[in-house]
Design a protein with these regions (language model features):
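Phosphate-binding site recognition
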Residues: 1-153
Length: 153
């Protein structure tokens, strides 16, 4: 494995947000940077080091149905949720927002910019769900790469 250098400040910032999520409620961390500079590695290092409960979801250019099945399997496996059978990505986001009303969780969504390709309405759905639930949720949401013009904070 390649060595990981000079990212202590960034690691600490990410870890601090996740550690404080119980008190601060819903938090959004925006990760931006050129391709191949180590964004995914930074996130993995940050949350593996602290043993923070987190989900890593990769938005590949598949059908929404395929992603729903893939993400449901990850959620079932990582969170120990039984009988979770969502029909849409919106269902998954709604479930995770409800889940984080009881338990803190960091959710990393890689290749977030491709969400429009999977379902053009989903970005607005996520924004509406986030705005309605962030004050009651202990979710640390980390979408990346990210076009910051698209989401209100």
């Amino acid at each position: 494995m390649k060595k990981f250098y000079n990212r202590q400040k960034e690691l600490k910032a990410l870890q601090t947000v996740s550690e404080q999520i119980v008190e601060t409620k819903g938090q959004l961390s925006v990760m931006v940077g050129r391709r191949r500079v180590g964004k995914t590695r930074l996130l993995n290092e940050a949350f593996h080091q602290e043993n923070t409960k987190f989900l890593y979801l990769f938005i590949s250019r598949k059908s929404e149905r395929s992603l729903v099945a893939e993400f449901a399997e990850i959620i079932n496996s990582e969170l120990g949720v039984k009988f979770f059978q969502p029909q849409s990505l919106r269902d998954i986001i709604e479930f995770l927002l409800d889940y984080t009303k009881q338990k803190p969780l960091t959710i990393i969504i890689d290749e977030f910019q491709d969400i429009d390709i999977v379902n053009p309405a989903l970005f607005s759905d996520i924004q509406n769900l986030w705005d309605a639930n962030k004050r009651d949720s202990m979710m640390h949401l980390v979408p990346f790469p990210f076009n910051s013009d698209r989401l209100s904070y």
